[in-house]
Amino acid sequence: MDHKYKVGGYVKLAKLWERSKDAAVAYHSSYYVEKFRDDADKRLVGVYIDITGNKEIYKRPEMVHLLKDCKNGSVNLIFSQTRAYLAANTCDFCFLLQYLFDMSMRVDIVTDDDDQRIDTI
């Protein structure tokens, strides 16, 4: 089956989750598998989970990994439960958008945020 979207699920958790890392990774991985299990247009490529106190995008290894996968064409849809997982502030979020827009291929962003719909960007 050929899927239109290759999804990378992203989660950024606070450093305090380090103690419960295995449970957090299992929960979020399961969330994304269930979310895209029966979606004919989307195939889950991977779940990228940062557990860190670092707010800057370049200091989050899994976010950097996700962006590299976007750049090489492995991922063309970033899905996050909330915009806050993607960037700590508006400046970082704009940097992320500019980086994605400058790529040669289209990469979309979708969140589950009910009050902050960014999936039309």
Question: Which residues does each predicted region cover?
Answer:
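Short, structured surface patches at the beginning of a domain
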Residues: 1-121
